[in-house]
């Protein structure tokens, strides 16, 4: 009702003779209708098919449903749509649930979760769909079709030969096909009694406009002459996606259907099915596509790893043992992954980019979801990860590193200190150990390029003198080391660059890192002096090779 009133408002505004009070009254009516609509319990669903791993676009759909439900104090459920058993992939359903759990957006109803509208797997609801299909036939909105696969293929070939490559079973061609609209009633009854294979097809009305309002895209109008007579019920006794989807959404009291743009072409059929049953349709919202980084085409499952980044939330291993990488195993935090996905197609209307899940719930609205596709940016994704890693407590990161590296030989307190020194420079938690390996052991490799560029003839002499100063520091902490270092530079009349970088290279082997006085304090006096004594001859050998 609300979209129809909005349509009236727009028409009245364009009419110069319209009384302004009329527009005001219509707008008040819109507000009233919105209150009525939102007074109904919000129930949304994420309805993936278990045909393989869950693509990040699917995770975004689940996320937007979750945010919308939480925003409106509603219910978010998951329904597994496995009507196409030929494409069923073992393990896919478990993968989907595990991925949602890792992302922190678990539904409150679904397989294994309970709920009063179950079962939540369509193959387990098989018995309930046939009566609905038969009801449509009885109401003359659908019909039995007995055409065999061979006969349909023959029709397609004939159409191609006549210059019509895109043959469809529709309101025009159905009159020449083998179905209950063309066969005598007695023959239809006999075929059904004999158990002849058949499907039930939607009887698409001819030359009618189907109008519906999309919460993201506005009004959508499609003429039925552009639609074919889709199969609703298959010969194997299973419904197709279209029938099962409508029946399940209705019987599960779904208030809003929030799904990907790829389902927009099916929406007119779904609207007609609701009308045929005499049911109120839910609100529709079709989300924009996720695009490749260059903007050329949809980001697909086949792009996984091929473009240099994952497209799945977690690792997926095929039956043949082929691995497709996921964000979890790459080291991404779920908070960073979800934060990134939320902003792929939705704009909060403010400069804010870092959101907790609760903040996303508070800020989210379908009105700010874009109509156009959203380009995925792998570098921006790393930025979100870096930002979220820096927000983590040092103790939590250290605990995680101990869990993933059980042989790590370092105390909890020391590791926590190491994390504090390194996390500002890291993208992933594991970078702290790989990039900061010199904290745990004397380096076996050196930044030879920097050594050759920065090492002067007098540098080794300065470092030997600096070692003597280090030996004399009684309380070996960062502040005392810095004070001694500045005193040495002042005494010798040297600039900081003449000694600090060579000092770093002789202790860590690398030319950059956390503050060198902090690094020195972490390692301790004995370790620093031992390393310098061992490494200065190695550096001299590198210089001699040059």
Predicted regions and their residues:
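Short hydrophobic targeting helices and cationic amphipathic motifs
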Residues: 1, 6-8, 12, 16, ...
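Residue-level signal for inorganic ion chemistry
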Residues: 65, 96, 136, 140, ...
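Conserved phosphate-binding loops in nucleotide/dinucleotide-binding enzymes
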Residues: 119-123, 146, 233-234, 252-263, ...
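Active-site cores that bind ATP or allylic diphosphates and position pyrophosphate for catalysis
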Residues: 143-144, 148-303, 310, 323, ...
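Small-residue-rich helix-loop
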Residues: 394-492
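Charged substrate- and nucleic-acid-binding regions of tRNA-handling and nucleotidyl-transfer enzymes
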Residues: 478-543
């Amino acid at each position: 009702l609300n979209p129809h009133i909005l349509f009236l408002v727009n028409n009245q505004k364009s009419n110069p003779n319209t009384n302004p009070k009329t527009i005001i009254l219509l707008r008040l009516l819109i507000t009233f209708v919105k209150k009525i609509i939102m007074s109904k319990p919000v129930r949304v669903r994420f309805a993936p098919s278990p045909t393989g791993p869950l693509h990040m676009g699917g995770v975004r759909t689940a996320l937007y449903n979750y945010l919308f439900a939480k925003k409106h104090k509603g219910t978010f459920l998951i329904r597994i749509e496995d009507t196409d058993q030929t494409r069923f992939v073992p393990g896919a359903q478990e993968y989907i649930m595990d991925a949602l759990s890792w992302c922190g957006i678990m539904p409150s109803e679904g397989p294994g979760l309970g709920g009063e509208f179950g079962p939540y797997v369509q193959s387990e609801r098989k018995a309930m769909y046939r009566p609905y299909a038969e009801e449509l036939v009885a109401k003359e909105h659908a019909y039995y079709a007995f055409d065999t696969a061979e006969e349909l293929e023959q029709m397609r070939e004939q159409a191609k030969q006549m210059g019509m490559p895109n043959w469809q079973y529709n309101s025009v061609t159905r009159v020449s096909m083998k179905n209950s609209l063309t066969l005598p009633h007695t023959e239809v009854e006999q075929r059904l009694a004999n158990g002849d294979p058949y499907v039930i097809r939607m009887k698409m009305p001819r030359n009618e406009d189907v109008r519906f309002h999309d919460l993201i895209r506005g009004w959508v109008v499609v003429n039925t002459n552009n639609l074919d007579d889709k199969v609703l019920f298959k010969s194997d006794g299973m419904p197709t996606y279209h029938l099962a989807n409508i029946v399940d959404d209705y019987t599960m009291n779904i208030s809003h259907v929030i799904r990907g743009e790829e389902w927009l072409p099916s929406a007119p059929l779904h609207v007609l099915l609701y009308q045929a049953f005499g049911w109120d349709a839910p609100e529709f919202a079709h989300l924009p596509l996720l695009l490749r980084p260059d903007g050329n085409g949809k980001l697909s499952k086949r792009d996984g790893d091929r473009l240099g980044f994952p497209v799945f939330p977690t690792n997926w291993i095929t039956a043949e043992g082929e691995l497709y990488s996921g964000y979890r195993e790459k080291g991404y935090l779920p908070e960073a992954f979800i934060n990134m996905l939320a902003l792929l197609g939705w704009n909060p209307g403010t400069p804010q980019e870092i959101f907790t899940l609760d903040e996303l719930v508070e800020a989210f609205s379908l009105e700010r979801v874009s109509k156009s596709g959203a380009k995925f940016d792998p570098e921006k994704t790393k930025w979100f990860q870096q930002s979220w890693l820096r927000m983590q407590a040092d103790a939590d990161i250290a605990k995680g590193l101990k869990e993933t590296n059980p042989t790590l030989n370092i105390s909890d307190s020391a590791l926590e200190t190491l994390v504090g020194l390194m996390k500002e420079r890291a993208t992933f938690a594991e970078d702290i150990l790989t990039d900061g390996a010199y904290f745990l052991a004397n380096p076996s490799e050196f930044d030879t390029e920097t050594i050759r560029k920065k090492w002067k003839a007098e540098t080794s002499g300065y470092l030997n003198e600096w070692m003597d100063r280090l030996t004399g520091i009684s309380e070996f902490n960062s502040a005392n080391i810095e004070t001694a270092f500045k005193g040495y530079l002042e005494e010798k009349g040297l600039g900081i660059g003449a000694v600090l970088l060579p000092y770093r290279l002789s202790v860590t082997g690398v030319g950059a890192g956390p503050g060198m006085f902090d690094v020195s304090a972490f390692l301790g006096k004995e370790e620093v002096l031992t390393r310098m004594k061992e490494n200065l001859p190695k550096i001299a050998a590198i210089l001699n090779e040059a």
